[in-house]
Amino acid sequence: MEELVGLREGSSGNPVALRELWSPCPRLRRGIRGGLEWLKQKLFRVGEDWYFLMTLGVLMALISYAMNFALGRVVRAHKWLYREIGDSHLLRYLSWTVYPVALVSFSSGFSQSITPFSGGSGIPELKTILSGVVLENYLDIKNFGAKVVGLSCTLATGSTLFLGKVGPFVHLSVMIAAYLGRVRTKTIGEAENKSKQNEMLVAGAAVGVATVFAAPFSGVLFCIEVMSSHFSVWDYWRGFFAATCGAFMFRLLAVFNSEQETITSLYKTSFPVDVPFDLPEIFFFVLLGAICGVASCAYLYCQRTFLAFTKTNKLISKLMATSKPLYAALAATVLASITYPPGVGRFMASRLSMREHLDTLFDNHSWALLTRNSSPPWPAEPDPQHLWWEWYHPRFTIFGTLAFFLVMKFWMLILATTIPMPAGYFLPIFIIGAAIGRLLGEALSVAFPEGIVAGGVINPIMPGGYALAGAAAFSGAVTHSISTALLAFELTGQIVHALPVLMAVLAANAIAQSCQPSFYDGTIMVKKLPYLPWIRGRPINSHRVIVEHFMRRAISTLARDAALEQVVKVLTSTDEAEYPLVESTESQLLVGIVQRAQLVQALQAEAPARASGQQRCLQDILAGGCPTEPVTLTLSPETSLHQAHNLFELLNLRSLYVTSKGRAVVYVSWVERQHTGF
C-alpha cells in the first residue's frame, strides 16, 4: 500500500507524507533536521574520519582506565583479605587460591557461553581477518560485553595467573572500530566499502596497544609488524592520530584522578644520562639478545606443542569440549598453589603485582652487590620503599630467585595460554625477558664490581639497563617484531639505552625468525585458521621455485556453450565455491568467474524451462541475470614463488588462476602455497 501524501501549507505543490504533516511540531522538527544537516556539512568539510578516529581513541582510553581503576581496587581487596584472615595456613591458602579459581572459572564460563570467539588473545584471528579472510560474527558488537567481563575477571586475579590485557584489548578496540565504521557509513550515507572498513580496523588495532601502555608510536608500529606483512602508508596518519588521542586521554585521566602530577611514562626509571653504559658492554647486550632469541625459540616450540597436545589429547579435548570452566579451574588451582607466598611463591616474588615486577627489575642498583655483606629481611608485607627485597632469599640469593622465577614462569605461562578465557600474553613475556636481562646484568655486576674500564674511566654496570634490553629482546623475538624496543623506551621514558637495546632486539629476532614462527602465527597454525604461510628465512633455493612446481593440476571449468546437464554434473561432482568461466570448451579462454551459490540459485529458477524439454546452455542462464565477476589478475606458470606470495599478501587474495596464453590452466591458493616446503 502506497503511503498517503499531501501538500505543505504554502507550498508550490511538492508532496509530503501525511505522517510528517500529522507528527507533533512539524516545523520545529524540520528546522532541527535542517540545522543538523547544516552542522554535519560544516563539520565533515575537513573530513569525517577525524571525528570517528578521535572518538575511537577517547572511548578506548576511557574503557582502559576504568578497567584499571576498578580492578586495582579489587586486587587490593584480595590482598587485604589474605592479610587480615589470620595466621592459619589453611585459611590463608584458601583465600589465596579460591579467589582466582572462582574468577577464572567465571571468566571462562561466561565468555564462552556468550560467544566462542571471546577466548584467548584475539590477535591471531584479527591477523587472519586483515589478510582477507571473513570470520563470521567475530567483530560483532554483541561480543564486546562478553570480552570485557571475561577480561576483567582474568585481570582481577592479579599476578597469580600472570596474564595481561594487550591482545584482548586490541580485539575490543577493533570491535569498536568496526562498529564506528558502520555508524560512519550510515551517517554520511555511502555504501559499505571494504577498504574503508580495513582502515578503521587497522586504526583500532593501534589504539588497543596505545591505550594499554600509553605508547602511541610503538602501538602503531607494533600493529604494523604483527598484523600484516604489508602496510599502506595511507593508514599511517589514521593509526597515529587515533593512537595519540587514546594515549593522551589515558594519561590525562590519571592526572585528573590525582594519580600523577603531570603526563609521564608508566614506569619511572633513574638511569644516569651522562654515561649509561660503556662501549665494551655492547658485546654483552648482543649476547643478551642471542640468549633471548634461543630462549624464545624454546618457548615458542613448547607453547605450540603443548597447545596442540591439549587439542589432540582425548581426555583434555573432551574436558575442553564439555566443561571449559572445569579445565580453567583445575589449571588456575595449579598456578595459584605454586604462587602461594609461604610456599614456593616465596622464591618467585609472588607478592608483587605485574607492575611492581617491572618497577623492581628496572632498578638501576645491583642487588647482588647490595646483599653481598648484609641480608635484607623478608617483611610480613612488601615494603613500598624496598620492593626488591621480595627477590631475595638468604638460601637462594638473588641469582637463585631470578633463575627459579624464569624456570617456573616459563612453563606456567605455557599452561596459562591453554585456558579458554580472554587473556593477553604480551606483558608476561615482557616481564620474563626483563628477568633474563636482570639475571645477566647481576652476573656482570658481580664479575665487574667496580665497573668496566673504558677510556680510563670506570663506570658501574646497571642491571636495570640489561633488564630493559632483555624485556624488549625476548618479547620482540616471541612476536617477531622490532617495535618492542621503542615500546620499552615509551614505557620508561628513557632512551639512553637506545643503541644497545635495538642491537639486542635485532640479534634476538635474527635467531627467532629463522627458527620458529611467531607466537601469533603458531597459534593460527594450531587453531587451523586460514593463513598464508611465511617464507621462513627466504632461502636462496626458494627463488628458483615457480608456480608450475606447486600449482593445482585438476580444475573444473564451465564453458559458455556447455549444456545445462553438463553444468549440473560439474556442480554435483565438485564442491568449489567458484568456477572459472571459459569462452568455449575448445578454446578454454578465461573470461570470468561465476559463484557456485548464485549459479545454483539461477539453475533452480530455470527448472520449469528445463522440465518442458527446451535445450538451453549456460550462456542462457548468464544472460538471464546470473552475475559473473571479471578476472582482474592471473598468474603465469613461470611466475616465481616470491612474486605469487607478494601478490597474495599485498592484495589480500586467497586464490588466483593460472593462465597460459589466455587459456585457463590451473588454480593456486593458500593451500598449494603451504605445500611448497618454504
Curated annotation (Swiss-Prot):
Residue sites binding chloride per the record: S121, F426
- Describe the location of the CBS domain by residue ranges: 551-612, 620-678
Q: Which GO terms describe its molecular function?
A: metal ion binding; voltage-gated chloride channel activity
Presence of keyword NAD:
no
- Binding-site residues, Ca(2+): E259, E261, D278, E281
Intramembrane segments of this protein: 116-127, 203-224, 349-360, 464-496
Query: Known SUPFAM superfamilies for this protein?
Result: CBS-domain pair (SSF54631), Clc chloride channel (SSF81340)
Which superkingdom, per the lineage?
Eukaryota
Q: Where are the transmembrane segments?
A: 51-82, 91-111, 141-160, 161-180, 236-255, 282-310, 325-342, 400-420, 421-440, 500-520
Q: Where in the cell is it found?
A: Basolateral cell membrane
Q: Which GO terms describe its biological process?
A: transepithelial chloride transport
Cellular component (GO) terms are:
basolateral plasma membrane; chloride channel complex
Extract the PROSITE patterns matched here: CBS
Pfam family membership, one: Voltage_CLC
Q: Which residues are glycosylated?
A: N364
* Catalytic reaction equation(s): chloride(in) = chloride(out); iodide(out) = iodide(in); nitrate(in) = nitrate(out); bromide(in) = bromide(out)
Tissue specificity, please?
A: Expressed predominantly in the kidney.
Topology relative to the lipid bilayer, per the entry, is: Multi-pass membrane protein
Keywords annotated in UniProt: Calcium, CBS domain, Cell membrane, Chloride, Chloride channel, Glycoprotein, Ion channel, Ion transport, Membrane, Metal-binding, Repeat, Transmembrane, Transmembrane helix, Transport
* Cytoplasmic membrane side: 1-50, 521-678
After translation, the protein is modified as follows:
N-glycosylated.
Family listed = Belongs to the chloride channel (TC 2.A.49) family. CLCNKB subfamily.
Function description: Anion-selective channel permeable to small monovalent anions with ion selectivity for chloride > bromide > nitrate > iodide. Forms a homodimeric channel where each subunit has its own ion conduction pathway. May conduct double-barreled currents controlled by two types of gates, two fast gates that control each subunit independently and a slow common gate that opens and shuts off both subunits simultaneously. Assembles with the regulatory subunit BSND/Barttin for sorting at the basolateral plasma membrane domain and functional switch to the ion conducting state.
* Quaternary context: Homodimer. Interacts with BSND.
Q: Could you tell me what this protein is called?
A: Chloride channel protein ClC-Kb
Give the originating organism.
Oryctolagus cuniculus
